[in-house]
Structure formats: structure tokens, C-alpha cells
Amino acid sequence: MEDRCNFLYDCTDRSDELSCEIVSIENEKYQKIFPPVSNGTKTDIFVSIDVLSITHIDEMARTFTSRLKLYFQWRDQRITFNNLSPHGNFLRDSLLDHIWLPPLYFSNSKGWILITGKEHITVNILRQGPPYLNQASELNEGKEYRGDENDLSLIAYHQLDFDCIYELSHYPFDIQKCSIDIKVADQFRQYITLMPKKINFLGKST
């Protein structure tokens, strides 16, 4: 089973690489616009940020520029995953059109920017839970993984200008506190909880 859907032909008839769609969704029930809320509980989205650089600090314009790599993880119990690899299971762009992605924005950037827009992201499935054999009705043998036991992992890259209110009354001995603010779209705030994990500064110290 481990050799099924591994992008290599291990069977002489090549049947091990047929029907290898990684995501199974009941299209008549799955509604992409709605978060994966279950039994009245909110969807937890775990957030980490790598700050790759901070540049172009402009006190007069009250802005700074930052290059970011952002990590988001959540689970969607409405999805079944198939034949997951332990080494990475990246989703094609076409699949991203059919699954729910967190509607998150930078609220203090120049213009509210959607963090999870397709042009900025990659999405991977992390194999964490145990496998289950396909149902007997399935024509192709393989393993299934439950959406509530395996994380969806989204990585986003952005370089943007952010607003910051600089306090200059003690210049040049001042210390400024600026932020990068991430918000959930208003209509979904009652269904989603952002869970901060860590933030790393990977740029050059000056």
C-alpha cells in the first residue's frame, strides 16, 4: 500500500498510479464558503510568522515595509485524504478552488490584503493520523485519512507596507512598537479562533 500513488509505476499494468486524487469531497454537501465548524465548536487556526526583513522605515509617512513568511494550520472534518505520503502532499491550484481556506487579512497594510489569495500560497497536507482501508465499495485499493486527524498546512509569502503610529517625542532615543495585524473576515469571526504559536525574526540586526 505504501507504494500506491507515489508517482512511480510499481505494478506492471501501472494500476498503482490510477485514481490518485489526494482529496475526496462530497460536492453536494461541502460548501467552500463555510468554515469547518463541528458540533458548535470554532475552527482553530494556528499561526506562526517568520519576519524575513524589515526595511524602508518611514517616520513621516508612518509606515514600514516587511517581507513575511506565514504559516497556518487547521483541520477540516468534511474532507477525506487519500494515500498520503509521509514526505509532503501539496495540493494543485485547481484543488484550492474546491476547499475552504481561512479568510484572513492584514488589517494594517496599505489596503486590506487577503493573506490566503492563491497567488501567494502553497497548501500541504500533513500526515499525522492513522490510515484506514478504503471502503469495500471503492474500486481502487488504498488508504484513507480523516480530515479531523490530519492538518492542512498553508504557507503564504508577502512583502507589504504596513501602517505604524510612530511616537517621536523622545527622538532620537525613542523605541517604536509596530505590529503586523491579522484579522478574520468580519462575517466569520464567530466561527474561527486564531491561535498564535510563534514569531521569528530572520532578518539582519542593525
Place the predicted regions along the sequence by residue.
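Non-transmembrane, solvent-exposed beta-strand/loop segments in proteins
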Residues: 21-206
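Activation on extended, non-transmembrane soluble regions of large proteins
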Residues: 1-7, 13, 45-48
